[in-house]
Amino acid sequence: MQVYLVGGAVRDALLNRKVIERDYVVVGATPQEMLSQGFTQVGKDFPVFLHPKTQEEYALARTERKSGKGYTGFVCDASSSVTLEEDLLRRDLTVNAIAQDNLGNLIDPYGGKKDLENHLLRHVSEAFSEDPLRVFRVARFATRYAYLGFTIANETMALMQSMAESGELSTLSAERVWQETKRSLLEKTPHVFFTVLNQAHGLNDWFAELESNLDAAIATLKTAVALENAAKENFDKSGQLENKPLETKIPESSSSGTTTLIIRFTALLAHLNEEEAKRLCNRLKVQNQLSEIVILACKFKDFLLNTQNSPADLLALFNGCDAWRRSERFTLLLKAFAPYAHYKDLDWQRQQEHIENALSAANQVNVQDIIATGVKGPAIKEALNQAKLDAIASIGE
């Protein structure tokens, strides 16, 4: 039995990046031998085991043979006769097909180290085309390492284009596509993911709504990142956040990343109309917390951008967004809308403060005070709306 460190841990160590997790491949072993040494089997489709102490993953060396459509149609051979080189051959990119033994020696049969030095993402073999998810994985790796100058090899891009044109991308599950998308959106240069997919002709099946206005979507996504970076720079200089509008406050870190993800995804989709945003979010099965913000931004963007809103317009905005009961969501909507407003050259700080002041004024209206005047039945709602309109109008006086 021989054990090798493989994949991302080797790659990132060679790039002097922080290694987050370690995966190992085991050559010359059987499942029974692994279990007898205290490992716990967790893999359903192929033998993967958790180390009894570290809980790190150890997978038996395996080969894969295409047997059907999509990313699940494979026959796996994980017998003890499978060699390390055979296991590495099935991997997607050469930079992910480097192994390291327990003495620190590299086993690199497919030139991954040289490709790392040349900042090149290149497929290991023609078997790359058997798994359509790899189009999205390569786009994600290109996104992650773009700041280091990595590019995709021409022959790999050609293969990705042929895979997209074959229709195989449509066989993927929404969950897998969204997972790759979500992870890419939290990288330093998230726009690269969509640029690569466009180059690979891979937007049509999952992101068709973006195709007609991709340049604007990417520009707005870049704006979101620029606002975050400016906030971080201000934070680093001052050591604390100043009293600044929501859009310039430092975002959550990518470890939790929920707020950052919402802001960036909203920036990407803000150019769409409401129905287009709904279609895209439903197709990808985006979680409600995120899709609600995106759809509201697309539905009410004209109200949010209009600096001449009447009290009736603002009340319609608050009612439509249920800002009364969902105040935290509305606050997050304003934060997420900032990149699009900046893209449109709007003084968002001033506009946001105006909207927030109007909402605060309307929230001061107490329905019990209205009822106390003797108003009854349907007239209560009418009187409540009128009182809110009067309160909103008063902030400009």
Swiss-Prot record:
Q: Which HAMAP family match?
A: CCA_bact_type2
Gene Ontology BP terms: RNA repair; tRNA 3'-terminal CCA addition
> What does this protein do, in the record's words?
Catalyzes the addition and repair of the essential 3'-terminal CCA sequence in tRNAs without using a nucleic acid template. Adds these three nucleotides in the order of C, C, and A to the tRNA nucleotide-73, using CTP and ATP as substrates and producing inorganic pyrophosphate. tRNA 3'-terminal CCA addition is required both for tRNA processing and repair. Also involved in tRNA surveillance by mediating tandem CCA addition to generate a CCACCA at the 3' terminus of unstable tRNAs. While stable tRNAs receive only 3'-terminal CCA, unstable tRNAs are marked with CCACCA and rapidly degraded.
Q: Name the UniProt key words of this record, in alphabetical order.
A: ATP-binding, Magnesium, Metal-binding, Nucleotide-binding, Nucleotidyltransferase, RNA repair, RNA-binding, Transferase, tRNA processing
- What is the official name of this protein in its record? CCA-adding enzyme
Q: Which PANTHER family does this chain map to?
A: MULTIFUNCTIONAL CCA PROTEIN (PTHR47545:SF1)
Q: Which cofactor does it need?
A: Mg(2+)
Example GO molecular function: magnesium ion binding
In the UniProt record, the gene name given for this protein reads cca
Q: Which residues bind CTP?
A: G8, R11, R91, R137, R140
Catalyses which reaction(s): a tRNA precursor + 2 CTP + ATP = a tRNA with a 3' CCA end + 3 diphosphate; a tRNA with a 3' CCA end + 2 CTP + ATP = a tRNA with a 3' CCACCA end + 3 diphosphate
Q: What family does the entry list?
A: Belongs to the tRNA nucleotidyltransferase/poly(A) polymerase family. Bacterial CCA-adding enzyme type 2 subfamily.
Q: Which organism is it from?
A: Alteromonas mediterranea (strain DSM 17117 / CIP 110805 / LMG 28347 / Deep ecotype)
**What EC number(s) would the UniProt record show?**
2.7.7.72
